[in-house]
Amino acid sequence: MVLIKNSFKALMVAHVFILLGFIIAGVSTYYFSQQLLDPFWWMIFVGLGLYLVYIPFNSIFFDRLIAAFSMKGNAGFFIYVADSVGYIGSVSVMLAKEGMSLQIKWTQFFSQSVMILSFVGVFITLYAMYYFTKKHKASLVATAS
């Protein structure tokens, strides 16, 4: 993404990578739940999908968002907040597992969570792409006037 000089285009490319990550994680989990995908490959694809979501989001997304809209801000702060939300989710799952007597199969819990979060993630990412494209077009019109 360093090769893309236009910050808005780079922001959209980051969205595409995030979208692909959600799709890979969700589709591979669906195939696993239908017993069409071996558990080993399911873990590989879910890991790849989550990696494709996490890396652009935490290393490129905020930096290019700030640059694309000429905002004053610090990408490090946004990355810290996003990581904190992720850690809260991880800790919540661990506390629920250890603190409550939940009778749950963790493979089922994980696969359902991946399916739900992938589905939600695709729609949120598509909406974000729409929103930022609309905002970018409005800022171009405002600067042209």
Where are these regions (language model features)?
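Structural signal for the C-terminal ends of transmembrane alpha-helices
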Residues: 1-6, 130
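C-terminal transmembrane helical hairpin of 12-TM major facilitator-type secondary transporters
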Residues: 6-55
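Extracellular/periplasmic helix-loop-helix junctions in multi-pass membrane proteins
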Residues: 31-40, 95-112
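Alpha-helical transmembrane segments of polytopic membrane proteins
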Residues: 44-50, 107-122
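Intracellular juxtamembrane helix-capping segments at the cytosolic ends
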Residues: 52-70
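A late C-terminal transmembrane helix in Major Facilitator Superfamily
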Residues: 68-101
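Multi-pass alpha-helical transporter architecture, strongest
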Residues: 102, 115-145
